[in-house]
C-alpha cells in the first residue's frame, strides 16, 4: 500500500497555546509511561509538521516492545528503531499529528480501533500485519505515514517520500 501523504506545516502560532493545552493530558501520560519503563534523557525530534519527545527503552529490556506514541511522546525499543529508522519515526510522528486533532480522545479512540482491528483480524488475517494494525484506520488510512511503510517494505522513495521526511524533520 505505502500511501504516504505530506503533512501540512503547523503555521498558525496563535493556536499553539490551545494545542498545547489540548494535548497536555495525553502527553503527560506519555512522559509518565516512559519514566515508569525506565527511559531517561529524551531527545526532541520533529519538524514543521509536528514534534515529539523520543524516549529509548533501556537496552535489553522490553525486547517485545516496538514503538508507541502517547501524545507527543514516542517510546521505542532501540533495536526496532535501528531496523526501521526514520520511517518508524515518521509513522510515530504521524500519530502525534493525530493527537493534535483528537487531544484527550486520542487514546480511547485508538484503543477502540485497536480492539476492533484485533477482532476483525481473528476472522480474516492480513499477511505481514499485526492484529492491532491490520484493520485500524488510525494506523493505515487516517495517517500521513501508514504502518505499511514498516510492515510491508521497501519503504517509499522519491520526491514525495523526501518531502514527507523533511516535513517531520527527518532528512539527512
Positions of predicted regions on the chain:
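Short charge-dense sequence patches
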Residues: 37-41, 91-97
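Catalytic Zn2+-binding segment of zinc metalloproteases
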Residues: 93-111
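Metalloprotease/metallohydrolase-associated module, dominated by Zn2+-dependent proteases
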Residues: 2-65, 78, 107-172
Amino acid at each position: 500500500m505505502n500511501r504516504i501523504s505530506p503533512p501540512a506545516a503547523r503555521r498558525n502560532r496563535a493556536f499553539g497555546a490551545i494545542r498545547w493545552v489540548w494535548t497536555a493530558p495525553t502527553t503527560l501520560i506519555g512522559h509518565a509511561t516512559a519514566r515508569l519503563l525506565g527511559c531517561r534523557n529524551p531527545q526532541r525530534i520533529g519538524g514543521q509538521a509536528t514534534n515529539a519527545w523520543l524516549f529509548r527503552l533501556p537496552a535489553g529490556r522490553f525486547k517485545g516492545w516496538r514503538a508507541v506514541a502517547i501524545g507527543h511522546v514516542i517510546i521505542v525499543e532501540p533495536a526496532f528503531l535501528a531496523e526501521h529508522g526514520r520511517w518508524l519515526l515518521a509513522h510515530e510522528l504521524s500519530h502525534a499529528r493525530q493527537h493534535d486533532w483528537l487531544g484527550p480522545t486520542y487514546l480511547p479512540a485508538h484503543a477502540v480501533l485497536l480492539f476492533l482491528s484485533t477482532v476483525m483480524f481473528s476472522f480474516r488475517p492480513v499477511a505481514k500485519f499485526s492484529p492491532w494494525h491490520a484493520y485500524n484506520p488510525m494506523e493505515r488510512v487516517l495517517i500521513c505515514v501508514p504502518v505499511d511503510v514498516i510492515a510491508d517494505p521497501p519503504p517509499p522513495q522519491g520526491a514525495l517520500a523526501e518531502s514527507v521526511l523533511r516535513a517531520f524533520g527527518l532528512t539527512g
